[in-house]
């Protein structure tokens, strides 16, 4: 299934959390912090959003940092994604 976001929305997939701490302790699944770094898998067209022209600054494949509580989590074909607005993205990781 393909997902096509509307307006200034983007679809992201979280990157995997670290399995070990810096000191080498292996973390169980429940102790891992959800990462705030993700890869963009789909980008909306931008355009007129809330009466303002929005140009999309991100593209598919970009690695980004995003606000911890931003967007809506969805499950598609067994995979977890987050749909959020472009302004919830804090930075592009280069």
UniProtKB/Swiss-Prot annotation:
Keyword terms of this UniProt record: Chaperone, Cytoplasm
Name where it's found: Cytoplasm
This protein's superkingdom?
Bacteria
Q: Does the keyword Chaperone apply?
A: yes
The protein's predominant localisation is cytoplasm
Query: Its family?
Result: Belongs to the GroES chaperonin family.
What does it do? Answer: Together with the chaperonin GroEL, plays an essential role in assisting protein folding. The GroEL-GroES system forms a nano-cage that allows encapsulation of the non-native substrate proteins and provides a physical environment optimized to promote and accelerate protein folding. GroES binds to the apical surface of the GroEL ring, thereby capping the opening of the GroEL channel.
Protein's UniProt name:
Co-chaperonin GroES
Organism of origin: Clostridium botulinum
